[in-house]
Amino acid sequence: MLKRATVDVSSPADVPQPKRRKAYLTGADQARDEYAEDAIKHMEYIESETTPDKRCIPASVLEMRPEVIRSLIKIHKELNLLPQTLLLSVNLLDRFCCKKDFLGQVYYRVFSCAALWIASKFVEDKDRVPSVCRVLDYVPSGMYCNSALFFRLEICMLNVLAWRVNHPTPWCFIQLFCPGEGNKTKVRELALDICTARLPENRWMAIRPSILARHCLLHACNNLFSDTSLVEMYGSMPRDKPSTH
């Protein structure tokens, strides 16, 4: 009987080193492998510049963050947006909080809605982007916010971020590290669920997406497959040195 994997990846530091495949690749397979490695290197460069620095966020904001992110996850689900949209919106919001101080949870929630709307326009097809009126339905009661004010908040956020919206989220790395169909589809789906569950936890916010993606994939493999399957799956990931921003 096959034993389940018992890899402990409860924290970022526990994520083990991935192993390169030793199988000989030729033709199209080798080209795809080289392309994936180039893509990962480029994404890792971008993530090094767009991962938020937790030390720059005020303690009062960190205290409010878990509840605000949980609310954002709920809004994202109700709007039926893509996984990439949620992950990008959380990154935009965290980066904004690193550079801009504001007062109270109400403003925090409004800016979270603005981040989700910005991310949706960057990720979603045009016909899937929610209208401003739809997004304003989620603005906290007690705060007056019409479309004109919301547009100003959006521009404020973009200016603070220097209009740099692109960011390789954990979902981008999950898809690169674990391509294919069949069981790997289940692994990606479970890894995404694990990643989403990690979002409200402040300790994960400054972890680079590539490291978080490996953590989530390991947990997914550990839950779904035997120890042999875990080694085979994790062995297809590129070599990298776990690090935090």
UniProtKB/Swiss-Prot annotation:
InterPro entries: Cyclin, Cyclin-like_dom, Cyclin-like_sf, Cyclin_N, Cyclins_cyclin-box
Key words of the record: Cell cycle, Cell division, Cyclin
SUPFAM superfamilies linked to this entry: Cyclin-like
Keyword set includes Cytoplasm: no
Residue ranges, annotated region (Disordered): 1-21
Pfam families, per the entry: Cyclin_N
GO biological process, any: cell division
Family to which the UniProt record says this protein belongs: Belongs to the cyclin family.
Chain's role: Essential for the control of the cell cycle at the G1/S (start) transition. Interacts with the CDC2 protein kinase to form MPF.
The protein, known as: Putative G1/S-specific cyclin
Organism: Colletotrichum gloeosporioides (Anthracnose fungus)
Record gene name: CYC1
